[in-house]
Amino acid sequence: NPTDFRLLIDEYHILLKAYSYRQKAVDGVLDSFRKYKSFCFMSATPISADFTPSILSDVELVEAKWDNTDTLIVKLDQTNHPYVKAANYINAYKKDGYLEINGNKSTEAYFFINSVTDIASILEYCQLGNEEVKIVCADNPSNRNKLAGYTISNSRSANKPFTFITSKSFEGADYFSETGMCFVVSNSSNTNTLLDISTDIYQIAGRIRTESNPFRNTMVHIFNSVGKRKLNL
């Protein structure tokens, strides 16, 4: 009986993002949430008022105000060939075993790319071995076929020098690394990799939880406005 329970919908902005392919499930939530003893829709990146479903228009909005907040630094790296640029960063890590930024050395790189096909291309081009990479994506036959020779992991698996993450873990997954650096890769010719700056960027920025990590609040966004999808090398 729903009236015996309280309902909490965490990361509720995903309801809007997922509506195109999970319409029945999302409608089920929106049609039934008022039946519960109480309800709460919660997110660190709430839906803009312009796009909030009308059924939520009369729900009280409570905004948490924090006394101390971190400033996110996004380093923009525009290029005609985003995957080549990502490969260059990987090769720089491999050459010296680290990437030095402002006197701090990063020994682990986290690449957020929402395309298993493109991740596989980068792995092949950079000649990365299974022991060097952690790949976090949906574990299904299609992805296993694309990533033949590589293990599909989860966020709790042991750290590797290079971690590749699809939208499966853009939200709700925590990573712990003393020197991990976040790289977001977007390609204008592959819509799967395009990000919502009001939600995705902020969610990705909070994935590495280790407070002592000097790169915790820094992110490199590799992107293009024109160019081809493939590495073509």
Task: Indicate where each model-derived feature is located.
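Conserved SF2 helicase motif VI
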Residues: 189-217
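Conserved helicase ATPase core of P-loop NTP-dependent helicases/translocases
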Residues: 134, 140-166
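Conserved Walker B
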Residues: 11-15, 169, 188
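A conserved SF2-helicase RecA2
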Residues: 220, 225-233
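Conserved strand-helix element at the start of the C-terminal RecA-like helicase core
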Residues: 89-126
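SF2 helicase motor core recognition
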Residues: 1-2, 43, 162-182, 203-214
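Interdomain hinge/linker at the junction between the two RecA-like core domains of SF2 helicases
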Residues: 44-95
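SF2 helicase catalytic motif II
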Residues: 2-38
